[in-house]
Structure formats: C-alpha cells, structure tokens
C-alpha cells in the first residue's frame, strides 16, 4: 500500500509539472500572437524567462523563503536540543545531509522545508509546534519535512513558484501592451477569416485565465506532494500515529500570523486555515486533514 501511494503520487506530479510547463509556453505563444505577430517569438521569450526565474529562485531559495516567513536560524543544539537532535536523527535515517534548522516565532503549530536539493536544504518549525507537540509527534512532523527534502519536493516547489511568477509577469506585460494600444490589427484578423478570429479570442482568454490555471496547477502539485511526504515520513519513523496526532493538533489550531501567503503551499498544513465553498478545493494548497489521516491509518 505504501509503495503504491508513493508511485501514484510521483506519476501525478509528473503530469502536473508537464501541464504547468505547457501552460507557460502557451501563454508565451498567446503573447507572441497578440503583440508580436509571431507565436514562436513569444514561446522563446517565455522559455527564457522561465529558465532565468528558475535559476534565480533555485540558487537562493532558502534565504529568500526564510526571510519571507520571518524565520531565524538555530546554529547548534543549545537553544532547542530536542528539535536539533530529532532533525539530526531523521536526516540520518533518511540518508540525507543534516539540513539547516530555523524557528518561526508564531504560536500556531506548523512546519515547512525548503531549499534546492538535500545538500542545500532547511527545515523550519514554529515556536507553537515546539510548545504543543510531544516528541513522538515532532518526530512525525520532521520525518515528513525530511521526506520533502529527500524526494526533491523542495526543488519542485521552487520551480512551480518560479513558473507561476513567469506566468504573472507575461500576463502583466500583455496587459500593459494592450493598455498602451499594442496588439494585432483587427482588420487583419477579419481578413484572415474565422480561424484568425478564433485564435485571437483563444489567446485573449488564455491571457486572462492563465494565472488562474497556474494557481490551480500549483495547488494540485502541492496536494500530491503532501500525500507523498506523509507516506514517506511514516516509512522513516515506522509510526503513523505520531504524524496523525500531530496533524490533528495542527489542524485544530489558530491561523498563523508570520507566514507569507506565497509560501503557504510549503507548510505541512495550510497556515491560514483556508476552507471555502463550491470549487474551493481546487485552490487548497493541502489535502483535507481527514483524508490524510485516513490514508495514514490505512497503511
């Protein structure tokens, strides 16, 4: 059951990432069609921007994310010895280098991992998690975060964040060009027949709906990786109850104050406790706690 879940979530992640990349290139093509009379130029611009953003994000993601979430680094075991030794132990079991350890001063219990790869990774927990979780529960949480590092989820999350930023930038460029009178000549489109009109309408819709689709893809990726990290974390501790109890405590707590909204998908549980009505699950950064607990209990 465990290995089935891991394999299934890895496949879903591949599909979501392919869709994400195709969306970036499609929006680039729409931008090229609408404002440059050449879809290939738009695709090339989108690809170059995506590559630049990904390199920038990957090279400095840890420091950027930690600053955004007001986290401060623990240099040794003197401040939080239990936390330090649990991270050390779980990293050893997971066969990864010891990640950097950070604390976020927030009363709400939560945690996240970030970085580029296992050699350049970091784990952050809130002061609230240290106050409310026992050792067994904290081990479950840290094992979950170590699994994110081991499975390269941290890199995937960084890439998804960069691609979402590129989509937002491309759409902003298109909006500004449209506002200042750029774009295709309507007479040319009418002379080109129905095909050109359809392409024009589709391109405009893609520019409008692109950021929405990017957000849905980013959240879908996050949800899949949470299931995978839950399963992989239990593989490290051999104790699903520790993570189950931790998730239940975290889900019943108050929203965080220190978390940055753009980093919400990184946390083990939604730091803002967002839960909406019809269709809102598409924009949830995490699967429902009830479903995660059920899967853990079925292992």
UniProtKB/Swiss-Prot annotation:
Domain of life of the organism encoding this protein: Bacteria
EC number(s) per entry: 3.4.24.-
Swiss-Prot/TrEMBL keywords: Cell membrane, Hydrolase, Membrane, Metal-binding, Metalloprotease, Protease, Transmembrane, Transmembrane helix, Zinc
Binding site for Zn(2+): 144, 148, 226
Regions that span the bilayer: 16-36, 39-59, 159-179, 197-217
Cellular localization per UniProt: Cell membrane
Membrane topology type: Multi-pass membrane protein
Entry similarity comment: Belongs to the peptidase M48B family.
Identification of the protein by name: Protease HtpX homolog
